[in-house]
UniProtKB/Swiss-Prot annotation:
One of its GO terms (cellular component) is ribonucleoprotein complex. Part of the 30S ribosomal subunit. Contacts proteins S5 and S12. InterPro entries: Ribosomal_uS8 (IPR000630), Ribosomal_uS8_CS (IPR047863), Ribosomal_uS8_sf (IPR035987). One of the primary rRNA binding proteins, it binds directly to 16S rRNA central domain where it helps coordinate assembly of the platform of the 30S subunit. Keywords: Ribonucleoprotein, Ribosomal protein, RNA-binding, rRNA-binding. This is Small ribosomal subunit protein uS8. Gene3D superfamilies: 3.30.1370.30, 3.30.1490.10. One of its GO terms (biological process) is translation. It comes from the Bacteria. It comes from Methylococcus capsulatus (strain ATCC 33009 / NCIMB 11132 / Bath). Pfam families: Ribosomal_S8 (PF00410). Belongs to the universal ribosomal protein uS8 family. GO terms for molecular function: rRNA binding; structural constituent of ribosome.
Length: 131
């Protein structure tokens, strides 16, 4: 069975893993998922991630992060969906929680946080927001 939105699957697995108190989750690998995980790691929302191969299938192991037993990520939500893409110019990128959260943006220079996209002067597709 093909998956219609692999990025939403990643976000849902992160949300469910943290709700269950898991230390790590495993997701099928893709370049976009790796790029999103890299941004989450750089911004301090996950402890880390690594590529693993089990039974010939490439996966990503995401190490979830907690602070005093509570998940670091309060809310992670998909913005641009396959049926309704959301693009924003560099001046229109959302400020999540007044700058305390991040939006992950896919630009022509790669996947990055909204802060970095503003600093390099790029707009793009707003993939998700993290609070």
């Amino acid at each position: 069975m093909s998956m219609s939105d692999p990025l939403s699957d990643l976000l849902t697995r992160i949300r469910n893993g943290q709700a269950a108190g898991k230390a790590e989750i495993i997701v099928p690998a893709s370049k976009l998922k790796r790029a999103v995980c890299q941004v989450l790691k750089e911004e301090g929302y996950i402890a880390g991630f690594s590529d693993v191969t089990e039974q010939g299938k490439h996966n990503i192991r995401v190490e979830l992060k907690y602070h005093n037993g509570a998940p670091v990520i309060d809310k992670i939500q998909r913005v641009s969906k396959p049926g309704c893409r959301r693009y924003r110019g560099r001046d229109e990128l959302p400020k999540v929680m007044g700058g305390f959260g991040i939006a992950i943006v896919s630009t022509s220079k790669g996947v990055m946080s909204d802060r970095r996209a503003r600093s390099v002067g790029e707009g793009g597709e707003v993939l998700c927001v993290v609070e």
